[in-house]
């Protein structure tokens, strides 16, 4: 993970020496609008003649004649408002597509500190690449930018504010890139024990506490879901607790993440083609790890606890079978009718463990169901759970420009999970209807109460299914290239920041 060096300058765009100067262009009813920085003028009709439309993800380069820059790159911001979300997307699209430019200067309309931070984030996010396994790290392509300078003048922020914006953007982009790096790592190299190593590496020097349950401790403490899923592999499972508890924090947000380092489906084996890409099944755990890392770097005044539920789901003579019963943390028994519905089993243990600390809220995140992709496609995450918490998550996602959609948890679906011999079954075999919702209903069963009393209310809880948007299988868009997306990192950070102000 290498991020570009970010900086903010009040210099005039025309005077800045850079390999590329990024200028924003809008598509409006009246025609093309060039958001020209001070000291520069552009002929909108002339730009239209060479194919500039102002559409999103459009980047057109011309010679930097009349400026100190080598080239000028016009990036489209679309036809909507030129706000923080649009600017983050557009600038990220520019840095993702610009190659062979070591230093990029960005001169887009920045009217607030929020805009400035978003532009810095987008610039850093767009430069991501993963080349750890390539002989030629560039794969024949020119390198991306190593330095980005945002040119902005404003009366609403100080130099210290600009420095904080740079620090914030660096932490956020680092968290997204860290998530992508983990998800990109092949399962031969990333398995439960090495995932734990990565946790220690990412948290080194930060004010966080890490506790690890190995297979012996998991058995002693009754984590039957994580143990059951992992028992078919020669590489035993782990549960990792990463706790950030700053002095003075009055609110506690717990995060639970699915960390299946490879999902073959177990005895309920996946077909060959759908199995490709199942290294992505640990995205939830990687996401919450990086959220805590970023929160600690930013010194957010909120207590965060991440529960990484890590296992490898493999078929073998020791693997769990359909018809087996697992006893979960807390004592609930689960009849396993499909071993490929394993994510909910490890997550249930994590939710119970998180509940035992009586946090103010629990959010779990997982690449949980193929049904999520069927329902919402490959760019929208599903959110379900307690209404107020779901609303806060959706607001945070909207603020960050991440696509999430609220879904119901119908009470009548609980009956579909009735078991003849256990407290609950993990699936309803042969009934694909509402599969994403059924998984959410299953997880809800394990959410604890706000206190030790039997009649205490349930802890506010939300479930985020990122099965589709965790992986971009097509071409790049905005600051997101092909491969893992780091979806929900920014939303969960924004949610945590909101908790710190509550």
From Swiss-Prot:
Enzyme Commission code(s) on record: 3.4.11.1, 3.4.11.10
GO CC, one annotated term: cytoplasm
Entries under Pfam families matching the protein: Peptidase_M17, Peptidase_M17_N
Active-site residue numbers: 270, 344
Main location: cytoplasm
InterPro entries from the UniProt entry: Leucine_aapep/pepB, Macro_dom-like, Peptidase_M17_C, Peptidase_M17_leu_NH2_pept, Peptidase_M17_N
Broad class of enzyme this protein falls into: hydrolase
Cofactors required: Mn(2+)
Family indicated by similarity: Belongs to the peptidase M17 family.
HAMAP family, A to Z: Cytosol_peptidase_M17
Name of the protein in its database record: Probable cytosol aminopeptidase
Organism: Clavibacter michiganensis subsp. michiganensis (strain NCPPB 382)
């Amino acid at each position: 993970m290498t991020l570009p060096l970010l900086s903010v300058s009040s210099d005039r765009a025309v005077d800045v020496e850079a390999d590329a100067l990024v200028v924003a262009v809008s598509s409006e009813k009246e025609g093309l609008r060039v958001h020209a920085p001070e000291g520069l003028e552009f002929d909108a009709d002339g730009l239209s003649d060479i194919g500039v439309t102002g559409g999103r993800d459009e980047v057109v380069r011309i010679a930097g004649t009349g400026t100190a820059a080598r080239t000028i790159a016009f990036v489209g911001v679309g036809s909507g408002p030129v706000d923080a979300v649009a600017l983050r997307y557009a600038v990220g699209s520019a840095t993702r597509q610009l190659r062979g430019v070591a230093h990029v200067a960005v001169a887009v309309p920045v009217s607030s500190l929020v805009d400035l931070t978003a532009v810095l984030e987008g610039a850093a996010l767009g430069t991501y690449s993963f080349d750890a396994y390539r002989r030629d790290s560039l794969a024949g392509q020119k390198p991306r930018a190593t330095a980005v300078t945002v040119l902005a003048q404003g009366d609403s922020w100080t130099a210290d504010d600009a420095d904080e914006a740079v620090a914030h953007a660096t932490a956020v982009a680092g968290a997204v890139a860290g998530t992508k790096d983990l998800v990109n790592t092949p399962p031969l190299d990333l398995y439960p024990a090495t995932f734990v190593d990565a946790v220690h590496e990412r948290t080194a020097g930060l004010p966080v506490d890490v506790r690890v349950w190995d297979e012996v401790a998991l058995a002693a403490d009754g984590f039957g879901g994580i143990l059951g899923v992992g028992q078919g592999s020669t590489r035993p499972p782990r549960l990792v607790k990463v706790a950030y508890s700053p002095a003075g924090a009055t609110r506690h947000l717990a995060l639970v993440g699915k960390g299946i380092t490879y999902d073959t489906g177990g005895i309920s084996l996946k077909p060959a083609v759908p199995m490709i890409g199942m290294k992505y099944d640990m995205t939830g755990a990687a996401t919450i790890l990086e959220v805590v890392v970023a929160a600690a770097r930013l010194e957010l005044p909120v207590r965060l606890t991440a529960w990484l539920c890590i296992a490898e789901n493999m078929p073998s003579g020791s693997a769990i079978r359909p018809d087996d019963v697992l006893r979960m943390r807390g004592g609930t028994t689960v009849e396993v009718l499909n071993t490929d519905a394993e994510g909910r089993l490890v997550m249930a243990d994590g939710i119970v463990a998180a509940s035992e600390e009586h946090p103010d809220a629990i959010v779990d995140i997982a690449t949980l169901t193929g049904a999520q992709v069927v329902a919402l496609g490959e760019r929208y995450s599903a959110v379900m759970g307690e209404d107020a918490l779901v609303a806060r998550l959706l607001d945070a996602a909207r603020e960050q420009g991440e696509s999430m959609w609220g879904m119901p948890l119908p009470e009548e679906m609980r009956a579909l999970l009735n078991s003849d011999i256990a407290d609950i079954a993990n699936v309803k075999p042969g009934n694909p209807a509402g599969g994403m919702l059924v998984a959410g209903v299953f997880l809800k069963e394990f959410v604890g109460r706000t206190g030790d009393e039997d009649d205490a209310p349930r802890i506010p809880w939300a479930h985020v299914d990122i099965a589709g948007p965790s992986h971009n299988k097509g071409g790049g868009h905005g600051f997101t290239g092909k491969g893992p997306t780091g979806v929900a990192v920014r939303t969960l950070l924004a949610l945590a920041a909101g908790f710190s102000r509550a």
